[in-house]
Curated annotation (Swiss-Prot):
It is an enzyme of class 1 (oxidoreductase). The keyword Metal-binding applies. This is Cytochrome P450 71D18. Changing S370C: No effect on regiospecificity. It comes from Mentha spicata. It is a single-pass type II membrane protein. GO terms for cellular component: endoplasmic reticulum membrane; intracellular membrane-bounded organelle. Its EC number is 1.14.14.51. Its main location: endoplasmic reticulum. GO terms for molecular function: (S)-limonene 6-monooxygenase activity; heme binding; iron ion binding.
Length: 496
């Protein structure tokens, strides 16, 4: 019996050792296929690379040395950065279902209602249902056109405001941002919120804090960092303010009979869909509030940011400014109402917009997460890997773009590339299943105001400033706004 017991122990120990060796061999084999990465430090990994630099800039530098599929260790979090059109295509088309998830973060979890929205929602039945409602009921091209008179009225108000400046500099970024917020408010709620300024400020702060680079997000196992996170408490205070604004409005909205245009606004549609028989996943109040916050984030904040970047680039390139103004003024001459379809026919204006989006995409880094282990460009991507698709770097890659850092709208006359998710060298709105569902709404909120601003005003820099003085610095955060607002002197254009 003693011999049998000894044999059993030996067999168990041998089995354990063999199992360890096999697992180590498998791990070693798997690691041989992992993406390359720079040398990392204990505990922090590659976080020191991000000190003092914007993530999209740092990640491009890493890609230039280690390739378009590179591993970065962000604290405890294993991450991979994709920095080429080919790698982006693998993640957003070939393997799209596997990369359709979003990773978790304090910012998105707190301000977007436990990710019960569309932008940050996991890839699940709730997301599929909400996206279908968004595309077919809320922000379809037909509905976007129906909001046209709202845009026109608010643009006219903006033009009157700018025209009364009397030759003084105007904070164009601030005024365009206010206009964009009013357009979204009226389209979503059928009226202007009395607290819309506070809501717009909450959107800006939330986008700055939702990038996924908060220390508590990078060390998820550390209860101490989570406890001591000042941004977590800041976000919780912001969430309470947001609830106060939206809860009060939704309660009032339930009692009114119709939207301002005699039919349904976006919130009316969501209320109706709540009661629909074909709704499989309940649409909660948090879901509605999350969608409203999505609409402000992607429909107002990014639209005003894109217009600011476009005007800044045109001010630095007077010949381009003259060319696009000549096109707009010839096409819109004598018209009091500007239709979206007319603006979309202005080829050089569309090229200016594309070039602006190439250099300054609304979301420089598109966040994803792998659902299962897979392979991209020959490298193994483990399950639950945090993915960053560096849209900013792809848009400035000399492999796809000649003189990539130069603002040259004419390049889109030479090469046909669009931003609808089919040309992976140019994906400012993403691609695949998670391409921006409000793309048409956002574009309309950029193209028409930009055309009107270029038509009605000649623009000058404030006295003493030159083109070289324009600050083109980006700020950190999920979106990529300018560090400094655009302040210009508008002069009303008088048609000959």
């Amino acid at each position: 019996m003693e011999l049998d017991l000894l044999s059993a122990i030996i067999i168990l120990v041998a089995t354990y050792i063999v199992s360890l060796l096999i697992n180590q061999w498998r791990k070693s084999k798997s690691q041989q296929n992992l993406p390359p990465s720079p040398p990392k430090l204990p505990v922090i990994g590659h976080l020191h690379f991000l000190w003092g630099g914007l993530p999209q800039h740092v990640f491009r530098s890493i890609a230039q040395k280690y390739g378009p599929v590179a591993h970065v260790q962000l604290g405890e979090v294993y991450s991979v950065v994709l920095s080429s059109a080919e790698a982006a295509k693998q993640a957003m088309k070939v393997l799209d279902p596997n990369f359709a998830d979003r990773f978790d973060g304090i910012g998105s979890r707190t301000m977007w209602y436990d990710k019960d929205d569309i932008i940050f929602s996991p890839y699940n039945d709730h997301w599929r249902q909400m996206r279908r409602i968004c595309v077919t009921e809320l922000l379809s091209p037909k509905n976007v056109r129906s909001f046209g008179y709202i845009r026109q009225e608010e643009i006219e108000r903006l033009i009157r405001l700018l025209g009364s400046s009397g030759g003084a500099p105007v904070d164009v970024t601030e005024e365009v941002s206010k206009m964009s917020c009013v357009v979204v408010c009226r389209a979503a709620f059928g009226s202007v919120l009395k607290d819309q300024g506070s809501l717009a400020e909450l959107v800006k702060e939330s986008l700055a804090l939702a990038s996924g680079f908060e220390l508590a997000d990078l060390y998820p196992s550390s209860w101490l960092l989570n406890l001591l996170s000042l941004n977590k408490y800041r976000l919780q205070r912001m969430r309470r303010r947001l609830d106060h604004i939206l809860d009060g409005f939704l309660e009032e909205h339930r009692e009114k009979k119709s939207g301002e245009f005699g039919g349904e606004d976006i919130v009316d549609v969501l209320f109706r869909m709540q009661k629909g028989s074909d709704i499989k996943i309940p649409i909660t109040s948090n879901c509605i509030k999350g969608f409203i916050f999505d609409t402000f984030s992607a429909g107002a904040e990014t639209s005003s940011t894109t217009i600011s970047w476009a005007l800044s680039e045109l001010m630095r390139n007077p010949a381009k400014m003259a060319k696009v103004q000549a096109e707009v003024r010839e096409a819109l001459k004598g018209k009091t109402v500007v239709d979206l379809s007319e603006v979309q026919e202005l080829k050089y204006l569309r090229s200016v917009l594309k070039e602006t989006l190439r250099l300054h995409p609304p979301f420089p880094l598109i966040p994803r997460q792998s659902r299962e282990e897979c392979e991209v460009n020959g490298y193994t991507i483990p399950a639950k890997t945090r993915i960053f698709i560096n849209v900013w770097a792809i848009g400035r890659d000399p492999q796809y773009w000649e003189d990539p850092d130069t603002f040259r709208p004419e390049r889109f006359d030479e090469v046909s590339r669009d931003f609808m998710g089919n040309d992976f060298e140019f994906i400012p709105f993403g691609a695949g299943r998670r391409i921006c569902p409000g793309l048409h709404f956002g574009l309309a909120n950029v193209e028409i105001p930009l055309a009107q601003l270029l038509y009605h005003f000649d623009w000058k820099l404030p006295q003493g400033m030159t083109d070289a003085d324009l600050d083109m610095t980006e700020t950190p955060g999920l979106s990529g706004p300018k560090k400094k607002n655009v302040c210009l002197v508008p002069t009303l254009y008088k048609s000959p």
